[in-house]
Amino acid sequence: MNMSSTQQEHQAAPAAAKSAEETFEPKILAFCCNWCSYAGADLAGVSRLQMPTNFLVLRSMCSARVDPEFVLRAFAKGADGVLVLGCHPADCHYIGGNYRARRRIALLKMLLEHYGLDPDRLQLEWVSASEGVKFQSTITDFIE
């Protein structure tokens, strides 16, 4: 049976789409506090913990220094998810920066929902410098 090239392309399209879905790797951006979370990321790397490779870490001096515009721009530029990682409450190098970050993230989640984006694509987590395993699990769980 002979098929035209158009028919062959039409039949191959669903297979290609299915293959693309199976190999989808979300692009994740992680803003890490310099004093805790970034050191936790470093510990995870030095400990050779297995982590996905489809995330990018950006160091920020404090989780409160992550401007909402940075998050919105990340989504506009194609990020599938954004993590903001900071010091545990009461352990912030800048006293209350993590509390400020928590308020900002709550407002940003409402804004994302207003724009029709899933607010779960943005998360705030606390990771200390000694929590390399927690950094690994946070990244892995967020990507899954």
Language-model region placement:
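Iron-sulfur-associated redox domains of electron-transfer enzymes in respiratory
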Residues: 1-144
